[in-house]
Amino acid sequence: MAMYKRHGVAGLFMEGAVSKGGGAENAGLRSYVMAKLLWDVQADVNKLVDEFLEAYYGQAAKPMRAYFDLMHRQVRPGDGGRHIWIYDPPSAPYLGDEFLAGARALFRQAEQAAENDAVRARVRQARLGIDYVELTRAKRFTVAGEWYRPADLDGLKDRWSSFMSVLGQFGITNISESTVAARDDEDFQRYVRPYRVATLENNQLRVHIAPELGGRVTHIIDKRAGRNLLAEPQPGAKQYPDLGGLRVTPYTDYVTRMPGTTTWTLDPGATSTQASLTGACQNGLRIRRTLRLDGPTLRTETVLENTTPAPVTAAMQSQWDTDPGDLTAVVVQYRRQDGGAVEKVLIEPEKIPAGSESYSGAEQPDGEWRVINRSGGPALVSRFPKEQAARCYLSWTAKSENRVAMAVSSLSRVLQPGERLTLDADYGTGEPQP
């Protein structure tokens, strides 16, 4: 604020938590400090923080101040902290195990130091953010046998129920800005359950498919490296685990998804290296998708059929979200359809470590593109028949996770009754090109 005043700024819009239930992290402290600085931009911020904490937490102020400082150390450059971004998930790197352990210890000290129930309740409310981070981390899904599920599903459900009950006691209506807590509870009840998986495996890859999760492939495990080529979605994300992986989506055009959902089932007759899925679209179209392992490659063949009595405009998109490791060493390589060679550097100094691009016509890849980590490891390779592809999309982020997403869209066509649209794509590993 002092900088703004020096440059002649006469007014500022200061935004705090807007949910009617209140309860946002440090909302009272933030409002107090902002109000004081609006009156006097030269006020000592640390003194203001101490004033508020001592008045609000009494004898528990000292451990609460220690928690305040611990949180800030996670992102201060001089303390080896990480950059903080808007909409960071609970899995953000600055909310690591060491930080959580320190926070738990300080909140225990604060609760013990509280001189009465009113102060103890304030400490308990302040701890809800840490409780939520730990709760979402416990929600992480893994494959065990034929199931994709959290490790302790029953315990997780009990913890979630208790957490929601505490929110209600404090009158808190929002966990995050985008949705109300009641909707988050609905999503938890809907999505957090076991999902049966089908597994394909050869001597190079192991692939897990979850038909009930949009027919998506959740894992393509490179057995030589012992790692999943796909970026695993963050458990704090909305609608988790129905996110990410490798999936195909029907569109009415290149922007608008077809209305409703597609219900997928695993077809009979799967083998150890091949399986097929059938998807029933809500508008009556049908998708047939075959997945087959061939050495270091997962080959996919997808057919969208108009099974309705009327013409339907349709397109398909096949996308995989990859995790190639540290994006500062990652490039995307491909040859354009006009013959030009491209090596796209994803992370550049002094620029936001995220972005997206769309390619069509002569600019799009000529049937193959690769994600290469220059620090080592196999290339992540996607191939497709260029005559089937109308557009390609690339997006990446290194904010709170390392993720590179590559999507191929089919031609958009008006399908007459009984007509079909095909999109093939292969995904796997290869040797890095010089």
Language-model segment annotations:
Residues 1-13, 40:
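Catalytic-core region of carbohydrate-active enzymes that cleave or remodel glycosidic bonds
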Residues 11-14, 208-210:
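Structural recognition of the beta-strand scaffold that forms the well-ordered cores
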Residues 193-205, 212-214, 222-233, 272-282, ...:
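Beta-strand-rich recognition/accessory modules
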Residues 223-228, 319-336:
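Short edge-strand/loop segments of extracellular domains
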Residues 22-32:
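Histidine/acidic-residue-rich catalytic or RNA/ligand-binding cores of hydrolases
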Residues 7, 34-195, 416-424, 431:
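Catalytic domains of carbohydrate-active enzymes that cleave complex glycans
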Residues 17-20, 320:
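Active-site-proximal loop/turn and secondary-structure-junction residues that shape catalytic pockets
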